[in-house]
Amino acid sequence: MPRSGGINGNFIDKTFSIVANILLRIIPTTSGEKEAFTYYRDGMSAQSEGNYAEALQNYYEAMRLEIDPYDRSYILYNIGLIHTRNGEHTKALEYYFRALERNPFLPQAFNNMAVICHYRGEQAIRQGDSEIAEAWFNQAAEYWKQAIALTPGNYIEAQNWLKITRRFK
């Protein structure tokens, strides 16, 4: 269900909503594309306010309507963010993978996948399983390398971790 206000107290969100509404009126799109974007915009607004259940409902509806793979990748990415936030890491990884299938140029998805893998590696260490931890850390390294390859100036902490752990080649 589209939000009636559409604009919250955040200046950036207000600006985004205003620009989005203007673009919806002037760019030639089908009614389905406009409706999908409206749900996506409402999902982003709900997500920024911490209303994750509402955000997911809007994103799922946007996915039902959106046909463009590139646009779908961002919807899937945002669904992954919510699952990450909720501690549902397996679901989050699934949505990040699905986003990357449609758009392999999402460094933030690679980064988030790396963060989850690194976290799981730390959990394995706490549980005393260094072999499993090493596998998770190696997977994190691969994802961070992909993120860094796409945006070399970003993810400085990840670059430092890769160097310190001798995983950067």
From Swiss-Prot:
UniProt-annotated location(s): Plastid, Chloroplast thylakoid membrane
- Has the keyword Transcription been applied to this entry? no
Q: Which GO terms fall under biological process for this protein?
A: photosynthesis
Q: Which GO terms describe its cellular component?
A: chloroplast thylakoid membrane
Q: What is its main location?
A: plastid
The TPR repeat boundaries are 36-69, 73-106, 121-154
- Chain ranges passing through the membrane: none
Q: Please indicate if the UniProt record lists Magnesium as a keyword.
A: no
Q: What family name appears in the similarity comment? A: Belongs to the Ycf3 family.
InterPro entries tied to this protein = PSI_Ycf3_assembly, TPR-like_helical_dom_sf, TPR_rpt, Ycf3/AcsC/BcsC/TPR_MFPF
Q: State the organism's lineage.
A: Eukaryota, Viridiplantae, Streptophyta, Embryophyta, Tracheophyta
NCBIfam families, A to Z:
PRK02603.1
Q: Which Pfam families match?
A: TPR_1
Question: Function, please?
Answer: Essential for the assembly of the photosystem I (PSI) complex. May act as a chaperone-like factor to guide the assembly of the PSI subunits.
Q: List the disulfide bonds.
A: none
- Which organism does this sequence originate in? Cucumis sativus (Cucumber)
Q: What is this protein called?
A: Photosystem I assembly protein Ycf3
Kindly state which keywords UniProt assigns to this record, in alphabetical order: Chloroplast, Membrane, Photosynthesis, Plastid, Repeat, Thylakoid, TPR repeat
Membrane topology annotation:
Peripheral membrane protein
